[in-house]
UniProtKB/Swiss-Prot annotation:
Other facts noted in the record for this chain: Multiple telomeric associations (TAs) in the same metaphase spread often result in multicentric linear chromosomes that resemble little 'trains' of chromosomes, hence the name 'caravaggio', an Italian train.
The protein's role, per its UniProt record: Binds to chromosome ends in a sequence-dependent manner and is required for telomere capping.
Gene Ontology CC: chromosome, centromeric region; nucleus; telomere cap complex
Biological processes annotated in GO: telomere capping
Cellular localisation: Nucleus; Chromosome, Telomere
Stretches assigned to coiled coil: none
Organism name: Drosophila erecta (Fruit fly)
UniProt protein name: Telomere-binding protein cav
Single GO molecular function: telomeric DNA binding
UniProt region (Required for binding to Su(var)205), positions on chain: 107-320
Gene giving rise to this polypeptide: cav
Amino acid sequence: MSDTQISSFLRKYLADEDRKIRAQFKESDPKNKLILWMHEKTRITEDDLKRPYTKDEVRELCLRTKVKVDMTAWNCLWEAKKRFDAKGRFENKSEKFINRMYMKAVRRKMVQPYPEEYVAQRREVIAAETKKFNISRLDRWQKQKSQNRSAPESSSALVGHASQQDSQDNEAVETHEDQANTNRYSVSQMEPMARPVVSASDLSGIGDDEDEQQQQQSEFQTEHTDCPETQMRCDQINSGSLPMGLTNSESAPDYYMFGTQLSTSVRPTSTQEADDQIACPETETNESWVRCDQINSESMSIGPSIDSEGNISLQNSGSEPIDVDSMA
């Protein structure tokens, strides 16, 4: 891009601005040193105005700079509007009325349009200031880019230093582990402790039948603690309230644990027949538990029964007793 042409007006304007600032802030005063340093950095020079833009710089400025247009600068109508607003003449008025008031203000020379030469000169000054600002932006962005490029190099150096420190720490940890393993091996090589000698008299009474029965009873109670019938049965056995005839029978655990009758391998003896005859609460008659390998009860009426003389008869039926000897 071509450089900006410097007119005589712009050159004179910049020289006048520099002279005014230096006259106001004397170099002899040490307090004005910072102000003069800032003025020297921000002062518009001919070299700045002659500096051309590259395509990349123009593209970066267009992408990163917001463009604003000031429509109120050197506008006589804007000045008339400010005067009418101060008096409240435009409150609740139509747009047609407002336009007539603008024309009236210009016609009566309340405000006058700015000369074209004056507007061109002011635009030239604004363009020079804008270019100085753009140059400052480009220099700042270039400095940031260089810092970002140098940041990865510094970070890689830090990573290398950190990796070296980690390797040293790992070596220290491995040395400590080797020392610990050596100590553990030396401890394992020590003689084992002597076990106490147990005599035969100390083992007397271990494994007796009474202990085995108690152990089996405790295991049975532990396995069937969830069953309420089993718990009730165990409580009756421990309290001694259960008849001896039932506790000595092999069918007691089967009936109370699984809800079944006597097993087929068990035959009641003559001493147990009186205990086996239990009155049925519904018919108030004697009820037989097991006869001829079948479940026989008055309430269920299943299968035949054998009386005390050895005759077979059917429950709830009018049939005569059956002679076992004749059947043989």
